[in-house]
């Protein structure tokens, strides 16, 4: 995979992220119209910067380092990127209008326990973690993969706690 093709891949992931934001904005309006309450918003700007940085870091590291594509690493990582997208959109589809990039709970709606949520409490974050190390490693951007993984671990610790608190308070 050449640097150009890798750039196309990163561009496709960026387009997918923009599609997520369109869905999230639509779902946010739906949720707020039904009394939804947003919480955990203090960490959201950091999340946006971190995820944008992942994409920029992938491109910058690969283009500036001039690393060659290593098929034995690149193709398995590419498969993980694809699988992470499948899992992410399975989550989006399962949650329907309740899916969002923000933490928004609509009072009275039941906790979703189907789809991937019957297997894991936060499957979307599994997709984020896998994509966060796999996308850079498709073309050997190990520094980007490492930095994103460490920063994302801290972010997810805050995010999962905020999400669990929001869900708990909605059931009380």
Which residue ranges define each predicted feature?
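Membrane-embedded alpha-helical segments that form the functional core of polytopic membrane enzymes
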Residues: 6-11, 79-83
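Long, highly hydrophobic alpha-helical transmembrane signal-anchor segments
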Residues: 42-73
